[in-house]
Each structure stands twice: as structure tokens, then as C-alpha cells.
Swiss-Prot record:
Alphabetized Gene3D superfamilies for the sequence: Ribosomal protein L30, ferredoxin-like fold domain
Organism lineage: Bacteria, Pseudomonadati, Spirochaetota, Spirochaetia, Brachyspirales
Subunit architecture: Part of the 50S ribosomal subunit.
Gene Ontology cellular component list: cytosolic large ribosomal subunit
UniProt name for this protein: Large ribosomal subunit protein uL30
Amino acid sequence: MAKVVITLVKSPIGYEKSQRATVVALGFKKGKRVVEKEATPQINGMINKISHLLKVEYK
């Protein structure tokens, strides 16, 4: 399975509660962090939901 490197580039403050919860579910604890995940359909759906807050690189 492919890896995805996700960087949080914008704060979720001021966005819907569900979008903030998605940021936490992806593993971001503080702003401007980087996480690496497997590219599963569930992770891709979360990325699509908050794509305006993220920078995404596929490996």
C-alpha cells in the first residue's frame, strides 16, 4: 500500500466541529505538524474532507 505524507498548513480553528475532529483523527496534535499514513480509502476520504487545510504528498 502507498504511503501518504500529510502536513497541516492551516489551523482548523473557525471551521466546523466535524472538520476539527477529522484533523485530530488524522493524528495532528498541534499545528504545522507532519504525519505519515497508509493510503487507505478511509484516510483518502478524510484528506478530501479537509483538503483546504492540508498539503499532501504521495510516496
